[in-house]
């Protein structure tokens, strides 16, 4: 693994999952792997779990993490080629990225979509320009369209739950449902896109996506999933329910509905096979998910968030070993 931008950078998902779980069991077993190595963590938008878990993962491997809040602490960057920089941008990524390449051994970057121009966001210009000019491995801490560390964490958590529960006598695959939820503002499709991409690539589940009409995601990521606008039908016999809001893709970045009927509660959960409930966090309580779900025995959101460390540690370990 040289870069980590999407599931396409992973040769074998299950092998990487086992590596992450081995770090969970023994966090410091490779504490010298990153000795005398630095990772630069660049944030172009806010972060809590991603920021902290990546720093902890790097330190567990002996690396020195350095966090730089680009928007607040540095110059405004220009990403367009041949730009005439007579506006608000001060430094071009062509000049900044090679410097990061001199300072660090790995560059981890978190960007965010504008939700104004779909073509611009889905071109992934920001992260592609860093890959092009930095000259060192790049890890996505979330991009305009994907959140691979979150989705890898989700697979780890699902695998962990499946290992710890009694196995059915049949070889029935678990049913995983990704359900849209209401929100007070339009959110990116990153987490939903990425989760769909990883579950489909993993290939070990019956995968259903449910959302209101007009909230279809990009088919590039959902191909292979069953898609329905009937949430109750989707939830029947589900083993895992992943709750997430996203804004519209076709009429880009819009909110068409905030119907509270789409918020998961205990009554809806009764339709499932006592499903585990997942969310990437942060979550708007009693908007996206009810208190009774989040505080109940079926919620595994804290387990998910805890596993962010081991996901990041497995990825950084792979990159360090590849480039040692």
Predicted regions and their residues:
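Rossmann-like adenosine-cofactor binding region
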Residues: 220-299
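C-terminal helix-to-coil terminal segments
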Residues: 295-324
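Phosphate-coordination loops involved in phosphoryl transfer and adenosine-cofactor binding
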Residues: 33-39, 173-175, 274
């Amino acid at each position: 693994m040289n870069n980590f931008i999407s599931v396409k950078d992973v040769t074998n998902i299950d092998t990487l999952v086992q590596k992450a779980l081995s770090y969970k069991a023994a966090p410091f077993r490779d504490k010298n792997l990153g000795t005398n190595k630095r990772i630069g963590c660049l944030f172009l938008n806010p972060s809590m779990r991603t920021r902290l878990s990546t720093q902890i993962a790097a330190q567990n491997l002996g690396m020195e993490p350095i966090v730089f809040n680009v928007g607040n602490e540095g110059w405004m960057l220009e990403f367009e080629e041949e730009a005439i920089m007579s506006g608000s941008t001060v430094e071009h990524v062509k000049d900044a990225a090679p410097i990061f390449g001199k300072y660090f051994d790995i560059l981890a970057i978190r960007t965010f979509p504008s939700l104004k121009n779909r073509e611009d966001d889905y071109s992934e210009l920001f992260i592609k320009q860093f890959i092009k000019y930095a000259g060192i491995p790049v890890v996505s801490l979330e991009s305009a369209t994907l959140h691979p560390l979150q989705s890898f964490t989700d697979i780890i958590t699902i695998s962990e739950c499946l290992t710890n529960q009694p196995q059915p006598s049949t070889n029935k695959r678990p049913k995983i449902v990704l359900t849209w939820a209401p929100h007070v503002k339009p959110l990116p499709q990153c987490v939903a896109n990425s989760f769909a991409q990883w579950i489909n690539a993993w290939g070990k589940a019956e995968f259903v996506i449910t959302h209101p009409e007009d909230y279809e995601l990009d088919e590039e990521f959902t191909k292979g999933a069953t898609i329905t606008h009937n949430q109750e039908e989707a939830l029947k016999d589900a083993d895992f329910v992943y709750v997430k809001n996203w804004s519209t893709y076709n009429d880009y970045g819009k909110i068409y509905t905030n119907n509270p009927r789409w918020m998961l509660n205990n009554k809806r959960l009764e339709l499932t096979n006592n499903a585990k409930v997942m969310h990437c966090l942060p979550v708007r309580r009693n908007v996206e998910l009810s208190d009774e779900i989040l505080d109940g025995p079926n919620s595994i959101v804290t387990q998910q968030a805890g596993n962010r460390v081991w996901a990041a540690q497995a990825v950084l370990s792979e990159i360090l070993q590849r480039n040692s």
